[in-house]
Amino acid sequence: MPAPYVPKKVEDIIYYYYAKLVIAPSAGFERNYGFIIDTYKRLKSGDIQMSDYDREIVRIAEKTDECAFCGKKSSDCHPVHVVPRSLGIPPGMHNLVMACEGCANSKKEKDLMHWWCEELKQPRDEVPRVPLGLYLKIAYEMNKINFCLKKKCNSLGEVFSRIS
């Protein structure tokens, strides 16, 4: 959950979790909230921006035989949508990851956060980097084009439910 002083708006929730995502692996600061909050503030002020999809797409292309969710290597990985198409997400590579048969059959067209946290009972902070990066970028884009970034939002699992 974001720090108490992070506003409960869609944009803030997305920026906070994106800051956690980019800070953790690059510097080994997974729990260093000072760096996370600094990055969040820089995103919010426009000093820095979320990267485009290239980084995630390259990682997916390099690991077509590895499940993006469980890390299992398999020659039978299938493309799976990170965000359900039923939410109006335009088709494209930016919404696909490779998944082993078990994860693909389990996730299907479910929301990533609901599937990961509610069904698999996994901690929100352990969603793998590539699917979470895509999820956050798609959430930001979809909420921006639907003028929903300033709507109230209490959790990451609500960012797509604010789109009307």
Which sequence ranges carry the predicted segments?
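Residue-level detector of intrinsically disordered, flexible termini
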Residues: M1-P2, C67
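Short helix-coil boundary/hinge micro-motifs
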Residues: P2-D12, Y18
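C-terminal, charged low-complexity interaction regions
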Residues: I163-S164
